[in-house]
Structures are given as structure tokens and as C-alpha cells.
Amino acid sequence: MLYSENIKDYYLLDAGDCEKLEVWGPYILRRPDPMAIWKKQKPELWDKADAIYHRSKTGGGYWEFKKKLPEKWHIHYKDLTFKVSPTNFKHTGIFPEQAANWDFIYDKLKDRPDAKVLNLFAYSGAATTVAASAGISEVVHVDASKGMVEWAKENRDLSN
């Protein structure tokens, strides 16, 4: 597994039994993950979750908040800032497992000021923001969801 030391404020505490337990800044979130098919390694940690996502049998799901969390907060990658906000579909707006890919993107672009990037299905703009931070001439962000495009603009603005 590739891992990036450049993502700050996020780490995986434990995973297993089709769930993952993650630290997102000051908060611990418990979310479903169908790929975590092994047994939990640290069962004593799971009760420490500040929020738990429960799947609905009819699709989607809901968050159970064990303590009051803000609607949004921030995590950092290198010197960039990204918004985190639990959504109705278990997501948080950032896929931290992509940080190794962000490292790759930055490393490939940092010495190419004439480069141009087209980021399709770009979600909340983490990769777009990383590409722009490499100092290239143009980055185009495309996502079908207007809400995600707005979220990407917010991440861009947080990182400038």
C-alpha cells in the first residue's frame, strides 16, 4: 500500500468487520468499508468514535453523532487546506487514501510551469488544488455535481 506522509490531521486507527475507524483532525469517525473483511485489531478503540455512519437498508444512511461536531472542519495536505464535512452518503469530501496520488501529481508537475491539467470527475477538488499548487499554467476542474464544484472552489480558496 502506498502511503503519503504529506497528509496531516488524518490517519486510520483501525479497520475490520467491514468498517473503518479514522481520525479526521480532532474527530474520530466510524464508517462502513466493505473492503475491510478481516477482524478488527483494536476493538477497545471503537467506542471512542465521535460519529458513526449507519447504512440504511433502502440506500444512503445517516450519521449518529456521539458529541456535537461542527458542520465542517479542515485537514491539511502539505501546505494546502481541505474542508471536511460528513455527507449523507458516508463521505467526508476527501479521499485521504489518494494522498499518495497527490504526491505523484505534484512531483510530476512541479518542474513544468507550462503544463496544463484536465481533472475529470474531480469531486471536491483535492487533486485539482494539488495540481494548481505545483505552479502550472492551467488546471481545469470538471464534475457533474454543482455542489462538488462549489466545494472544490472552497478548497481552492482555503489553500490560497
Predicted regions, residues:
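Structural motif
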Residues: 27-28, 138
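N-terminal accessory targeting/assembly segments
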Residues: 1-4
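Short, contiguous clusters of charged residues that form electrostatic/catalytic patches at enzyme active sites
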Residues: 96-103, 107, 150
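Non-catalytic substrate-recognition/targeting regions of SAM-dependent transferases
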Residues: 7-22, 29-96, 103
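Conserved SAM/SAH cofactor-binding pocket of Class I
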Residues: 107-160
